Every structure is written in structure tokens, then in C-alpha cells.
């Protein structure tokens, strides 16, 4: 951690992560169903600048880059289970500013406009599908742009002097430079309708101690061609 002025602060460090995800999908045309699961880990670097970390107001800039490796499993309705690995780099730069516009009985009210660019280049390792022998190859990298705003409350707790929890709602516009594609032999296939997305997100973030945080959120994304996605996350972070 470094201070460059009377108030501002810059934090840099190393990070490690583990993730697990499950998903189910259904075709609106054929009614075919499929399911998938992913287990992965990653290592990376981060850096964050705060204009006024003591009062939690003003601008911030957050950057990070991570290399990740995943084990993937996909099961189709009329096909067997396919297993494959994927790995690659993800990097992000996010900027925003926090504004406090009220307080009542210890609870403060905030609004935070945000913008973010995410470079996503996690690619699958090429493999042949068991049932058909089709060569499945890597797709294309993506740059995701997000613009939005988050409204939240800061509610102090009695657990510790530095602890609080922050329920919030966020509205975002998300743009993806590339569709989610996979290459089968010499042709690309993917999901259409996710280039421009509207997102609404509800969640709560909790500072359980000076160095630990917990989070939970649910989000719903809507795009063109009847594209929609419902996402939930739960996590815990500790700073050393």
C-alpha cells in the first residue's frame, strides 16, 4: 500500500482464486437440454487507487490481470459427457466515483457510476468429440465493455468497529465485441443476441472485518433474439 497525497491511496498485490460453476440450458427451437460444470483456479496481480479511502468518497480506479485454468464438463440430452480443459488470460480496468447523498440513524445512502473494460481470452484446448469425432477448437477472445450505476446503503454492524454490510441494486449496459463461439471442424457456432445486453443486479456485500469481505448477488441479463441469462454468485475475500 502506498500514499501519494494527503488523502489518496494506492494498493497493489497478488491474488489467487478458486471457482466452481453449474449451468443448465434449453433450446427454444428443439427443446434439447444440456448441462455443464466448471472447476478452476487462477493467479494474478491487482492494483487499486482511491481518491479518499478514509471517507470512502470520490473517484477510484481498479485494475487486475489473472491467468486461469479450468476443467470443464458438458452433458447433452442425446449425447455422452464431454470433458476438456481451458486456460488463458483475463484482465480488467474499472473506474468510477462514489457519492454520498444522505444519512439517517447511522445508515448512509450512496450512488456510484461505473465503467469497465474486460479483456477475456480464456480458450479451450482442442479435442475431438467422442460421439461424432468432430474437432472442437478454440473460439475467439472478447473485449467486454460495461457502463452503469450502483445505488447502495452502508449499514454498520456490531460485529466489529470496521464491519458493515451494503445491500445494493445496479443497472448496466454491457457490450461484447465477440459472440460466445466454438469452432466445430471449420465452422464457428455460438450464441446470438448477447452483443448488447441490459442487466439488473441485486446483491449484498459485507465487510466482516478489517481485511475480509463476503458477497452475494443475483443478476438478470437481456439481449436480442430472446437471449436472457440468470446468474448468481457467492464469495468470500481475505486481504493479507
Spans of model-derived segments:
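Membrane translocator/pore-forming domains, dominated by Gram-negative outer-membrane beta-barrels
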Residues: 1-240
Amino acid at each position: 500500500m502506498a500514499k501519494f497525497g494527503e488523502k489518496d491511496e494506492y494498493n497493489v498485490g497478488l491474488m489467487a482464486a478458486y471457482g466452481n460453476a453449474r449451468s443448465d440450458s434449453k433450446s427454444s427451437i428443439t427443446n434439447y437440454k444440456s448441462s455443464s460444470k466448471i472447476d478452476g483456479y487462477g493467479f494474478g496481480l491487482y492494483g487499486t487507487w482511491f481518491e479518499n479511502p478514509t471517507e470512502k468518497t470520490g473517484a477510484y480506479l481498479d485494475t487486475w490481470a489473472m491467468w486461469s485454468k479450468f476443467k470443464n464438463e458438458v452433458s447433452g440430452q442425446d449425447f455422452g459427457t464431454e470433458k476438456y480443459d481451458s486456460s488463458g488470460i483475463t484482465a480488467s480496468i474499472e473506474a468510477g466515483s462514489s457519492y454520498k447523498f444522505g444519512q439517517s440513524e447511522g445508515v448512509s445512502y450512496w450512488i456510484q457510476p461505473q465503467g469497465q473494460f474486460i479483456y477475456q481470452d480464456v480458450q479451450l484446448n482442442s479435442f475431438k468429440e467422442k460421439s461424432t469425432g468432430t474437432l472442437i477448437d478454440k473460439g475467439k477472445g472478447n473485449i467486454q465493455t460495461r457502463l452503469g450505476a450502483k445505488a447502495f446503503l452502508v449499514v454498520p454492524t456490531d460485529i466489529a468497529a470496521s464491519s458493515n454490510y451494503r445491500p445494493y441494486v445496479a443497472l448496466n449496459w454491457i457490450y461484447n465485441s465477440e459472440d460466445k463461439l466454438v469452432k466445430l471442424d471449420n465452422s464457428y457456432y455460438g450464441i446470438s443476441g448477447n452483443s448488447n445486453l441490459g442487466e439488473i443486479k441485486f446483491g449484498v456485500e459485507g465487510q466482516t472485518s478489517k481485511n475480509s469481505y463476503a458477497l452475494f448477488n443475483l443478476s438478470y441479463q437481456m439481449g436480442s433474439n430472446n437471449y436472457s441469462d440468470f446468474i448468481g454468485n457467492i464469495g468470500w475475500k481475505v486481504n493479507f
